C-alpha cells in the first residue's frame, strides 16, 4: 500500500507513506507486458477485467506479424505494447505529453522495439492526420467518454483499415460512432459485447469489432 496527498493539481502529488515509494506497475500476463504508472495517471482500475479486455481485443483484431496497427488514444500503452508483441509495427497516438513519455518508457521497459508514439490532439478537426500518409492494416480505438467521432470522420470512404476494434466506456457515443462507420464509411459490425468493469454500477466497458465491407 502507498499513500499520497494531493494538495491541488494532479502534478502536486506528495508521498505520505512510504516517503520514497517504489514505482507502481500493473501486469498483462497474456502479453508478457508490465506497465509503470503514477498515482494520477489514467489506468483501468479493475486489473482483472483489464487483462481480459486486452486479451479479447487482441483476439478480435487478430494482429499478424506482417501488419501495421494504429492505436488511437493509446495512453501509456495498455493496448499498444500487447499489440506490438504480435504485429509487425504499432503506432500509438495520444494527446497527453506525459502519457506519451511514459508509453515510450514502458516500451523500453518491456524491450518492445516495434512501437512508436506520437503526440496529437485527435479531437481537433484542424489537426492534420498525425499518421500522415501512412496506411495501417488495422486500427484500435479506446477514446474517452466523448467518443471518437472526429477520428471516424477522418476515415476515407474507401481504402481504410480492414478491421477496427473500438473499446468504449460510453455505449452512447459508441452507438453514435458505429452509425457513422456502418452507414457512411463502408464498415459492418462483426462482433460486439460488454464487460462489467464496475460491478454493481450502471457503467460497462463495451467492445465492437468492425470489418471493411468492401
Regions found by a protein language model. Name each.
Residues 1-214:
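Rossmann-like S-adenosyl-L-methionine
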